[in-house]
Amino acid sequence: MTVMVSQIESIGQIVRDEVTVIWILMALVLLAYLILPNPTYRTNVKVPTVRYLGGWIPDQVDRLFFNTKATSVIYDGYKQYKKKAYKVLKADGDLVVLSTRKSSSPPPHSYEVFLRLVARVGARVFIGETLCRDEQWLKASIDYTKNIFVTIALLRPVPGFLQPLVGRVLPSSRSLNHQLAYIKNKFLGPLIEQRREMESSGDSKYEKPDDFLQWMMDLAKTEQESHPHNLAQRLLGITSMAVVHTSAMSLTHILYDLLVMPQWLQPLRDEIQEVNPDWHSTTQAHLIGLKGMDSFLKESQRFNPPGELSFHRVVKHDLTLSDGLFLPKGTHICMAAGPISRDADVMSDPDVFDAFRFVKENRPTSGFVSTGVTNMHFGLGRYACPGRFFAAFVMKAILSRFLTNYDFRFGPDQKDRPKNMMIGDKIVPNVSTPIFIRKRTTSQPL
């Protein structure tokens, strides 16, 4: 019994001691809050915080220890975060300790680089000089482009009758609606109203801008078509789907092809220097004169088309073809554009990447934008892609400047061409592959 009483008393003493420690700690916290003023210099910089005490201790208590434990805290921080910044807590504020080590920023993804370039070039033509350099516009339009294709990719495997329902709950689809409203209210709406006010003012000095937005405004025949919301939606749809995304993907494919087949790089640079030595005097004729580059674009597209199928149509009435095949109304038809362009009966050495193949052919249908029964990646006939001419000029202009002024390479772990991604029959370049890019020098190889 005496032993049991002794054990109970010991346990009671331990509990009292622990409670005393807790009370002392709470008193210190309270004292810190009462005595110490609010830190003058506080920062929300997202860097690691180095503490003398554990992370569960309130900041104010840690600040009390800085005067006596600063050396320990600073050295501990340096040991953990030698190559980057970290934060320490002082009584009067926060200190962000910077590193003197030179850190390299992560290499960009080629798709992101070209997406921004195409968006900026396209904006100059589509909405004029007012907005084409505006960073907020570029970000909003690029995000809108990305969300369109994320939404399309996510909805493709969904049955048609469920797509409207699923589309309403997709985060990318909801973001599209917010971005459209933001772009309309922040950029295009005010720009459209400003142009209409200037036009109706009767000012003889006012000249209509010569850009795509103005063409759409002039061609709008009904009040609904001319409403800023509808103009904005149509403009974004056309630029995002017909120009920005597809051109950025094609340029990414081309860059990957050049990285795994570098023997074609110098001939392209030589042609650029010969045809267009002065970038600032570039004309449409100069870009048309880049025959080797035009052939390279077409050969890259032959190996990496936007899709294996093209020439999509829906039969509007019962139809019997010349071979007797009956197509009832509503039948969805298409052509196997990908396999046709890799068919040995159509193309000599179809599995060999010959960058200047189409320069040698020198036929009317050899051009990048030409269409025919052996080249249907832009469609065929009356309804072939109307924006392919503009896209070709944009791609040649960007590629000319890029190849002339920059060297580029894969990361050390990337030896082969990144595998394309397949979304149904659609072919998309790997958009997550980092590319090291730097300004060209004549004496130092990359």
From Swiss-Prot:
Signal peptide as annotated in the record: none
Pathway of action: Secondary metabolite biosynthesis
Residues passing through the membrane, by range: 19-39
EC numbers on record: 1.-.-.-
GO cellular component: membrane
Membrane topology: Single-pass membrane protein
GO biological process, one term: mycotoxin biosynthetic process
GO-annotated molecular function: heme binding; iron ion binding; monooxygenase activity; oxidoreductase activity, acting on paired donors, with incorporation or reduction of molecular oxygen
Major localization class: membrane
Keyword annotations: Glycoprotein, Heme, Iron, Membrane, Metal-binding, Monooxygenase, Oxidoreductase, Transmembrane, Transmembrane helix
Glycan-carrying positions: 430
Disulphide bonds in the chain: none
Residue numbers binding heme: 385
UniProt-annotated location(s): Membrane
Cofactor: heme
Enzyme class, spelled out: oxidoreductase
Family: Belongs to the cytochrome P450 family.
Function of the molecule: Cytochrome P450 monooxygenase; part of the gene cluster that mediates the biosynthesis of the indole diterpenes penitrems. The geranylgeranyl diphosphate (GGPP) synthase ptmG catalyzes the first step in penitrem biosynthesis via conversion of farnesyl pyrophosphate and isopentyl pyrophosphate into geranylgeranyl pyrophosphate (GGPP). Condensation of indole-3-glycerol phosphate with GGPP by the prenyl transferase ptmC then forms 3-geranylgeranylindole (3-GGI).
Protein name, as recorded: Cytochrome P450 monooxygenase ptmP
Gene symbol of the encoding locus: ptmP
